[in-house]
A protein has these predicted regions:
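Transmembrane signal-anchor helices characteristic of membrane glycosylation enzymes that use polyprenol
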Residues: 11-28, 42-57, 75-103, 115, ...
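Membrane-interface transmembrane helices that cradle and orient dolichyl/undecaprenyl
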Residues: 170-173, 209-224
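Loop-to-helix entry region of an early transmembrane alpha helix in multi-pass inner-membrane enzymes
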Residues: 125, 140-163
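Extracytoplasmic catalytic/substrate-binding loops of multi-pass membrane glycan-assembly enzymes
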Residues: 95-110, 117-134, 144-148
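Short acidic/glycine- and proline-prone juxtamembrane loop motifs at membrane-interface regions
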Residues: 103, 191-201
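Membrane-lumen/periplasm interface segments of specific transmembrane helices
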Residues: 246-250, 262-333, 357-361, 501
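Transmembrane-helix signature of polytopic, membrane-embedded enzymes
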Residues: 165-186
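Membrane-interface alpha helices of multi-pass inner-membrane proteins
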Residues: 187-188, 192, 207, 222-238, ...
Length: 658
């Protein structure tokens, strides 16, 4: 029986560096800084749950007795996994209901709250419009508000992740209890990122792909579904391409029918990991790993801080945390080499599936020394549970060894998971701690202030919302932050400040000749036009005119703000001025002529008398531009009769040539 000493030692090191992350919660090691804004009660709950797991694992007979009772119930494996996944989904929903939504999901909720937003332009890499439609369909059925529906669908995404992982674990020969720990962690990460993004589906595709890979290697039959699922996963999220080396080795095995060699895979994987570690240390040494402990200034002077003990400790912390499971895998490889036996083909494939994503995780954003995008990091770190559970099944530990290793594994998994799915019942304290964390890491806190601003915006607290974006602009000149501040100043009728923010957005978008899809959304004037119409109804045309002018400043190439201004002038019955404005608009954009005619034709069919008068006046102005004097006379006659001889309409009618 092979010993688990290397495996236990590796996780002991991991527990040590995790403890470092807890003692220094401002360390931005992957996820642990979120512990800084969890309550003391939540941390006690973490410690109690970890102690309970450790106590149970020291008496395997208890676990064995419980497992025996469960085995007495005859259920199909797929049904059993589905029940476990649903139970996890209930837990995810409970956790989500008890925590404030301060992550990326808050921004998605902010967009879902806008019924006029483009469903194809949602936040995220490739968000499915069908999932947005699911949100809209669930709202009237469940009676939930947008955050409630969001929590429900996020929990469902966690269910999908857990179920897919359990199916893979069965293919890898891992017991459901051990697999469930990893599945819960995986689903919790999916829940934290908040929206039902395609990288959750990517994780499911990778799970099925690796399960089919293991099964087909054992049976000696090549499966075409493996490369097809690899392509699908990469289409869902490009981070999945890091799993392609394992797929390439599998395809090579399927074509040549030659077994994979342990030495070749071992040296390839080890060499790549050494290169990644080197890149990590070099970039962190010279620039400062700002994603980790931000204790040094950025720029050329950063090298003067490289010998600070906390700098060196933080580099080691991040490296061991990311590479710890790989070190365990290498220990297992050395243990296997002592017996002078080759690893099985599936074990080698999973080695490749572990090493390349971890290397990409370290080298993804090399000037930072570590992957900064957490959704990409989530996708790449999926390799860790794939290979770690596979390693566990390879060793086949004895009950005593399992009792010694399980507490370490469970504690590590809980500390990784709980910061993401969080148990936080006190929203006020959470907001205070979140703000505190942002101030500890000012150079990289712009996105955090963005999250907080979206949170306050949904709560209709405009002053807090504006403060968050002012703080965000101190650290990042993101044009979207300027846009949000412009909306705030418009709502306060602070026109000069709003104009300054609008000009900042426009200058950033048109700084070069290429306007990307993301920049197109920044100059979308629809929200400003809605605010203009609201001002027109509440306080008259003066404020509305200012908003429409700001909208024209935001996107000088758009015809929508001038059209909105002309339509407002029609409603004031200043038809001579409206005719001049429409003439200029049609000269610049001929398509607007048919749009205006269609709009006013729809108005004359409405039951409201005021809307019908507006429609006839608009049709008269358009007919005058087209040279249709008879049509203009007819439309104005209808408007005059409906308005009981309005003097402004009568004056415009009198000015028309007979």
């Amino acid at each position: 029986m092979q010993t688990l000493a290397p495996f236990r030692a590796c996780f002991a090191v991991l527990a040590t560096v995790v403890t470092f992350g807890v003692l220094f919660p401002h360390a931005r090691t992957w996820g642990f800084h979120f512990l800084a804004y969890y309550s003391f009660e939540s941390r006690l709950l973490l410690a109690g749950a970890a102690a309970l797991l450790a106590w149970l694992s020291l008496w395997p007979s208890w676990i064995a007795a419980a497992a025996a009772r469960i085995r007495q119930v005859q259920l199909h494996p797929l049904l059993f996994d589905a029940i476990l996944a649903l139970l996890c989904g209930v837990a995810f929903y409970v956790f989500a209901s008890a925590m404030p939504l301060l992550g990326d999901g808050q921004l998605w909720i902010d967009e879902l709250s806008n019924p006029d937003a483009d469903i194809w332009g949602r936040r995220g890499p490739l968000t499915l419009a069908a999932l947005d439609q699911l949100h809209y369909a669930l709202r009237p059925l469940t009676g939930m508000d947008v955050p409630g529906v969001f929590r429900l669908t996020s929990a469902l995404s966690g269910v999908v992740a857990v179920l897919a992982w359990l199916r893979f674990a069965r293919a890898a020969g891992v017991k459901p209890l051990a697999a469930l720990l990893w599945g819960f962690a995986w689903g919790g990460v999916a829940l934290f990122f908040g929206y039902v993004e395609l990288y959750v589906l990517m994780a499911g595709a990778l799970s099925v792909m690796l399960a089919l890979m293991l099964i087909s290697v054992r049976r000696g039959k090549f499966s075409l579904w493996v490369p097809l699922l690899a392509v699908l996963a990469a289409a869902l999220n490009y981070a999945a391409v890091t799993f392609w080396p394992a797929v390439a080795a599998y395809v090579a095995w399927g074509v040549s029918k030659r077994p994979l060699k342990t030495k070749g895979v071992f040296f390839t994987a080890g060499g790549l990991m050494v290169a990644a570690a080197g890149a990590y240390f070099v970039t962190g040494w010279h620039r400062g790993t700002s994603v980790l402990l931000p204790l040094w200034s950025s720029g050329a002077s950063a090298s003067s801080y490289v010998f600070q003990p906390r700098h060196l400790a933080d580099l080691a912390n991040g490296l061991v945390l990311a590479c710890g499971p790989f070190f365990a895998l290498l220990c297992g490889q050395l243990a296997a080499r002592r017996d002078r036996r080759e690893w099985s083909g599936e074990r080698l494939l999973l080695t490749l599936a572990l090493v390349f994503p971890l290397a990409a995780y370290l080298m993804h954003n090399s000037h930072l020394g570590m992957a900064r995008d957490w959704d990409i990091g989530c996708a790449l770190l999926l390799a860790v549970p794939f290979a770690s559970l596979s390693l566990w099944s390879e060793w086949q530990p004895s009950p005593r060894e399992r009792a010694a290793a399980l507490p370490l594994v469970a504690a590590w998994l809980m500390l990784v998971t709980i910061p993401w799915i969080g148990v936080q019942a006190c929203e006020a304290r959470a907001l205070t701690r979140f703000t505190h964390v942002l101030r500890l890491d000012p150079e990289r806190s712009a996105s955090g202030w963005d999250y907080l601003g979206a949170f306050y915006r949904l709560r209709n607290e405009p002053d807090q919302w504006a403060r968050c974006y002012e703080e965000a602009l101190k650290h990042s000149d993101n044009p979207r932050f300027h846009y949000n501040l412009a909306i705030y100043h418009i709502s306060r009728r602070e026109w000069e400040q709003a104009l300054g923010q609008i000009n900042a957005v426009r200058d950033a978008v048109y700084a070069d000749s290429v306007v990307t899809g993301w920049e197109t959304r920044l100059i979308d004037t629809r929200q400003l036009l809605e605010m203009g119409r609201a001002y027109e109804n509440l306080s008259g045309t003066a404020d509305a005119s200012m908003v429409y002018r700001l909208a024209s400043q935001l996107d000088p190439n758009s015809s929508l703000p001038p059209v909105a201004m002309a339509e407002m002038v029609v409603r004031t019955r200043d038809l001579t001025r409206a005719e001049e404005m429409f003439r200029m608009i049609f000269a610049r954009d001929a398509a607007q002529e048919s749009e205006a005619k269609r709009f006013y034709v729809s108005l004359v069919q409405e039951p409201s008398v005021a809307r019908r008068i507006e429609g006839y006046c608009g049709l008269a102005a358009v007919a005058r531009i087209e040279g249709d004097a008879a049509g203009a006379h007819e439309s104005l006659s209808h408007a005059l009769s409906l308005s009981h001889d309005d003097s402004l309409i009568a004056a415009y009618l009198a000015s028309l040539p007979q």
